[in-house]
Amino acid sequence: MSRAATTRMGLLEVRARRAVAGKGARLLRAKREVLASELWKLVHDVLEGRARLDEALHRAVKALELAKALEGEERLASLALPAARAVPLAVTVRRVWGVPTPSVAAPPLVRAADQRGSSPVSWGPSGADAARHHEESLEVLLTIASKELHLARLGEEIRETSRRINALEQLVLPALRSEASRIAAALDERDREDAVRLRRFRARHPRPA
């Protein structure tokens, strides 16, 4: 930080900068509190979502194993090929205290048997059940992915905000306080020297009676 002029105007300037930096640190702390509150809510949602995803995947794997046993892997593979599709995703961004956080949305993914690229009669009950469970798992996964992205973005912003707070409180504000003290001390010393010189001048040049 460059030194300010050792003048009363310089002292006022440094004190003004210190006030602005202090206000900035307080605002950043308030921002961090809001972001941390949002983050902890999201952590709870993500943990619940992961538990739901684990359950959905467990059901999907069990259903697939049963379908393989009853219908055979080759038949399931032949049904899976025409059932493949692209899933259109819509990514939107919302802001929390100016922090852009992405959100992922998709249309309903669970399809009826006649929407999977083959005649409904081609699907046995176990194969259709396995397909439905996997589509349900994908829906849960996309919901969690959106929250995970939001969580990661909030974590990054909280870390960046903490770095800025530390820089202000540990570097900028102490430096400004030190600079203000230096200027104030120099001005006081200058005032004392001026007072001494004035007394000497008056002693050498007394007023005529």
UniProtKB/Swiss-Prot annotation:
**InterPro entries for the chain:** V_ATPase_D
Keywords annotated in UniProt: ATP synthesis, Hydrogen ion transport, Ion transport, Transport
Q: Which organism is it from?
A: Anaeromyxobacter dehalogenans (strain 2CP-1 / ATCC BAA-258)
Give the family per the record: Belongs to the V-ATPase D subunit family.
Q: Which HAMAP family match?
A: ATP_synth_D_arch
Protein name as it appears in the record: V-type ATP synthase subunit D
The family database entries (NCBIfam families) matched by this protein are listed as: V_ATPase_subD
List the signal peptide residues: none
GO process terms (BP): proton motive force-driven plasma membrane ATP synthesis
Phylogenetic lineage: Bacteria, Pseudomonadati, Myxococcota, Myxococcia, Myxococcales
